[in-house]
Amino acid sequence: MPIGVPKVPFRSPGEEDAYWVDIYNRLYRERLLFLGQPVASEISNQLIGLMVYLSIEDDTKDLYLFMNSPGGWVLPGIAIYDTMQFVRPDVHTICMGLAASMGSFILAGGEITKRLAFPHARVMIHQPASSFYEAQTGEFVLEAEELLKLRETITRVYVQKTGKPFWVVSEDLERDVFMSATEAQAYGIVDLVAVE
């Protein structure tokens, strides 16, 4: 029988009795957010909503985004990144396992000096992909133009967040580049590696 999402007791300030809430809702109240799946519209919208709500609730307390994601869709990932830049609280990004593709883009998007990877975390960068093989010729050309614009945007963000020259990032995005936590730190995707 599946366990489901664990529940934990929570007591609201000023209340005598605790009640049971799922663990993620309890952690959200502490401003701890989680991306533990591929990036898609649903999780993107949930994280955006949480970041906006928590920043309205208190714009002086930092947010912490824990990540273990193989990447996913480009536009939902860019939407998460843009929201991280938009909200007033600093967003710490913490890579716990894998931050690949859009996951590494979001990881790099944390507040500079507040991006962390666990010692055995892995990071992977590459260029955005598309499903050209399904498109007709006219659609193919339009999609290729859009993909080039997205690649340019992603490259510029990595340049800004890592301090690497444009040509280096552009060349590295040509293929899958896997990095250890210390290599990701040297590259500028994270600022710190947690100690074992």
Curated annotation (Swiss-Prot):
Catalytic activity: Hydrolysis of proteins to small peptides in the presence of ATP and magnesium. alpha-casein is the usual test substrate. In the absence of ATP, only oligopeptides shorter than five residues are hydrolyzed (such as succinyl-Leu-Tyr-|-NHMec, and Leu-Tyr-Leu-|-Tyr-Trp, in which cleavage of the -Tyr-|-Leu- and -Tyr-|-Trp bonds also occurs)
CDD domains linked: S14_ClpP_2 (cd07017)
Pfam families cross-referenced by the UniProt entry: CLP_protease
Gene3D superfamilies, sorted: 2-enoyl-CoA Hydratase, Chain A, domain 1 (3.90.226.10)
GO terms under biological process: protein quality control for misfolded or incompletely synthesized proteins
Compartmental location: Plastid, Chloroplast stroma
GO cellular component: chloroplast stroma; endopeptidase Clp complex
UniProt KW Chloroplast keyword: yes
EC top class named in words: hydrolase
Keywords, sorted A to Z: Chloroplast, Hydrolase, Plastid, Protease, Serine protease
Family note: Belongs to the peptidase S14 family.
PANTHER family, sorted: ATP-DEPENDENT CLP PROTEASE PROTEOLYTIC SUBUNIT (PTHR10381), CHLOROPLASTIC ATP-DEPENDENT CLP PROTEASE PROTEOLYTIC SUBUNIT 1 (PTHR10381:SF15)
Its biological purpose: Cleaves peptides in various proteins in a process that requires ATP hydrolysis. Has a chymotrypsin-like activity. Plays a major role in the degradation of misfolded proteins.
Complex formation: Component of the chloroplastic Clp protease core complex.
Protein's name in the database: ATP-dependent Clp protease proteolytic subunit
Organism: Panax ginseng
